[in-house]
Amino acid sequence: MANVHDRLQKLAIILGGVLLTLLAMTADAVRQDLDAQWQSYADTQVTLEPAFTFPHATCFKAAALQYQLPETLLLAVARGESDFEPTARSRANAHGVMQILWPGTARHLGIHRLSDLYDPCTNIDAGARYLKELLNTYSGNMHLALAAYNYGPGRISKDGHNIPSGATWYSDYIFRHLNYVLGNGKGGKPIPDTLYSAIGQSTLLTFGEPYRAAAFIARLEKKAPSVSLDWFRRGTGEFEVVMTYAGRQEFDTSAGQLRNAGFRID
């Protein structure tokens, strides 16, 4: 019996090692895919104009010019962080449009009054300055800079190895919002000068974990591929899946398609 027990222990150790290796290989593959996506954006799309007229547009344009950053990148971060809400506050004590952490990151950026973070232009400038600093730290690698924006530079290695899964998720999450900002979503590019505030959002479900929100969207998109779906990390730490629509007609059409897919909007 002792020999059997020893053999099982050795087998468990071997299988555990194989599993860890496979997980590491998967993580590396995901990182490489994200690196490639962000590099493609850096090579071909950074000069493109936003597809919508977004809130605080003059603040974003000024910050992009000041720090030589793509305006669409700043907009993607802001949409993912707060959906452009100046008074947004997270349970991690991050504040404003770009969700600047108080007091640590804010003071690092020279902001010493919490109330200043609720001024959109001040907050957007701070977020842009921090992102530029991180891009310089990571030699222009957008994936790593965004991972550090979310997790802090102390937890993201410059060689990109052993990045926390949550930081990788965040980079992918912002890339999804970038596609929306560029007009690459299901609905295609909107009419020029369309106000972002004119696009409606109807909440479908809220999840406690990001992978559940992503899986729910993936299932719905297979059943109702023409419906515009998106998801946001809210200040509560929850993840909200929404249907987006431009006008009543699109709402009714999309709601009907979701009903046919087995999901009813009240």
Predicted regions mapped to residue ranges:
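Extracytoplasmic
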Residues: E209-D266
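Secretory-pathway/luminal and periplasmic proteins that interact with or process carbohydrate-rich
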Residues: S82-R89, L134, P153-D159
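Short, functionally critical alpha-helical segments immediately adjacent to catalytic or ligand/cofactor-binding
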Residues: L69-P86, I100, I124-A128, A145-G152, ...
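Substrate-binding/active-site groove segments that recognize
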Residues: R91-I111, A126-K132, A147, P153, ...
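Catalytic and substrate-binding regions of cell-wall glycan-acting enzymes that process beta-1,4-linked
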Residues: Q39, G140, L144-G188
